Amino acid sequence: LKFAAATIGGLSRRANNEPLDSMVYLITAALGYAALENAFFLFGPLQAGDIATSVVAGNFRFLGSTLVHVLSSATIGIFLAYAFCRPRTLKILSVTTGLLLATLLHTLYNILILNTDISFFAIFGGIWAGIVLVLVFFELVKRLNPYCR
């Protein structure tokens, strides 16, 4: 869903004219999706009048959920950025690889928070390590030649 939103919102447009753009469009789509998902998550307790649960659960949810969506979408964006000036076949392979890795990251996050006794803070630390890697790749992608030859 996030990839479709990013494709409609920017990836398929003429404005997507340099490698960094794919990361920006996908991260933007992830933030929008996470905001919508978090809002829906909060409506249940709020409708039941349980404001305290909504605030406490919402804080943890916003931290983990938003960052894991950014991490998984940025992963796809990184693969797209490195395939920017490559042939169409390589772009398709790159998107597929990025989607599979992003799905794996999100699935691992879901398994860890739902089915293990690992503390939220340990899981959150792993997500932050991934976000730091995204920032490193962001800087590396900025150095790529934006013009295809």
Task: Spell out what each predicted region is.
Residues 1-149:
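Hydrophobic alpha-helical segments at protein termini of multi-pass membrane proteins
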